[in-house]
């Protein structure tokens, strides 16, 4: 009888156990990296914003389909009025450099441009639906994400890693899956009256949203949330009010008001007000780019609600799309970006705090630096 080899017949067992241990260790590392408290908090905050957007979309569609009310500028005007009554008035009662009059004296023209970008971004996207298709709006609206990343690179000095570009690509793949599901479900019935004009409006709106979001991130992290909301409320009310009188006065006059229509307007205004109030808080602890990736799921929430309210057809691709978008969002949040200081800057360096997921810490350190200088 031949003797067994020194390793014996059980030789593969240690190898198998070692491979299993390595795989288990890899899973633990992945879990520890992707499912931290900061990432879970970011996901929850992003989906809260998505639900606010879903609320605005559902109420607008209900007004349009059930009551033939198409007044996007009036709806935005009500939101800006709420921002004015809360945050602009708050600035008026502040003292020192945070006072409303002091801010207007130093930066009035900048906030006029910001208010114009914000108002028109909301308006042109809604108007685009009259000219182009749902597919075009959903796909071209994603154009704002690379524009936002480019603006963040040059204005906020954000520096991205390869994983961030992969994550964005994954999110856009999820949007493509959602669009495919819409086509298969028969939601692509309207071919639009002038597709080219509609597509241009979508690209313009996406770019204006990107500009507004970058300005919002800068103001929220460098100045204050109240200043951003107060100034947007002030100039947004003025600009949207003027535009309202020019483009929608006939539509408003033709509305047959009742308590149901009024309730839908109130619901829209509350959802939009919550969106504007909470988005700066989320951007403060993350970034404008990560927020825009997180709210890509808003259309899916609207679709799920539409299954019951508007009789949409369900497709398993919607679930797949939601999963893909969330995977991309988690990937993006798993690795922090960094902030590169400009070559010449009079501001004390804060490169060690230049991380998206540490927005709150950034403000604390800036305040400490300011106190030390004083």
UniProtKB/Swiss-Prot annotation:
User: Where in the sequence is N-acetylmethionine found?
Assistant: 1
Looking up Pfam families in the UniProt record yields: SLC35F (PF06027)
Q: What is its main location?
A: membrane
Asked if the Swiss-Prot or TrEMBL record annotates the protein with the keyword Nucleus, the reply is no
Q: Which GO terms describe its cellular component?
A: membrane
Q: Which residues carry this modification: Phosphoserine?
A: 5, 25, 371
Residue ranges annotated as transmembrane are: 39-59, 73-93, 108-126, 136-156, 165-185, 195-215, 227-247, 263-283, 291-311, 314-334
Topology in the lipid bilayer is annotated as:
Multi-pass membrane protein
Which superkingdom heads the taxonomic lineage of this protein's source? Eukaryota
Q: Report the InterPro entries cross-referenced here.
A: SLC35_F1/F2/F6 (IPR009262), SLC35F_Transporter (IPR052221)
Q: What UniProt keywords are attached to this protein's entry? A: Acetylation, Membrane, Phosphoprotein, Transmembrane, Transmembrane helix, Transport
Q: Which GO terms describe its molecular function?
A: transmembrane transporter activity
Q: Where does this polypeptide localize?
A: Membrane
PANTHER family attached here?
DUF914-RELATED, SOLUTE CARRIER FAMILY 35 MEMBER F2
Outline what the protein does.
Answer: Putative solute transporter.
Q: Which family is this sequence assigned to?
A: Belongs to the SLC35F solute transporter family.
Q: Name the chain's protein.
A: Solute carrier family 35 member F2
State the encoding gene: SLC35F2
């Amino acid at each position: 009888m031949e003797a067994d080899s020194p390793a014996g017949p059980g030789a593969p067992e240690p190898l198998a156990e070692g491979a299993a241990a390595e795989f288990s260790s890899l899973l633990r590392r992945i879990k520890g990296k992707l499912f931290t408290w900061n990432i879970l908090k970011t996901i929850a905050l992003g989906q809260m914003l998505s639900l606010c957007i879903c609320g605005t979309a559902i109420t607008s569609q209900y007004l349009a389909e059930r009551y033939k009310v198409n007044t996007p500028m009036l709806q935005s005007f009500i939101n800006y009025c709420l921002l004015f009554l809360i945050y602009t008035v708050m600035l008026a009662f502040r003292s020192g450099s945070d006072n409303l009059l002091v801010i207007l004296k130093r930066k009035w023209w900048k906030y006029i441009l910001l208010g114009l970008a914000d108002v028109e971004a909301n308006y042109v996207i809604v108007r685009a639906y009259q000219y182009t298709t749902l597919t075009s709006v959903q796909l071209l609206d994603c154009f704002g994400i690379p524009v936002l990343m480019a603006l963040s690179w040059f204005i906020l000095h954000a520096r991205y890693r390869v994983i961030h570009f992969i994550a964005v690509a994954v999110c856009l793949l999820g949007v493509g899956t959602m669009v495919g599901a819409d086509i298969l479900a028969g939601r692509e019935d309207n071919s639009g009256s002038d597709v080219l004009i509609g597509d241009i409006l979508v690209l313009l709106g996406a770019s204006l949203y990107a500009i507004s979001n970058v300005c919002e991130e800068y103001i929220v992290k460098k100045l204050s949330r109240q200043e951003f909301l107060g100034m947007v409320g002030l100039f947004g009310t003025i600009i949207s009010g003027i535009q309202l009188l020019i483009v929608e006065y006939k539509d408003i006059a033709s509305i047959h008001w009742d308590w149901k229509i009024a309730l839908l307007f109130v619901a829209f205004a509350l959802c939009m007000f919550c969106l504007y109030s909470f988005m700066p808080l989320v951007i403060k602890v993350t970034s404008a780019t990560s927020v825009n990736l997180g709210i890509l799921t808003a259309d899916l929430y609207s679709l799920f609600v539409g299954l019951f309210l508007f009789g949409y057809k369900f497709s398993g691709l919607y679930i797949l799309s939601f999963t893909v978008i969330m995977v991309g969002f988690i990937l993006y949040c798993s690795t922090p970006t960094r902030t590169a200081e400009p070559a010449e800057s009079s501001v004390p360096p804060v490169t060690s705090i230049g991380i998206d997921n540490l927005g709150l810490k950034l403000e604390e350190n800036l305040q400490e630096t300011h106190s030390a200088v004083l």
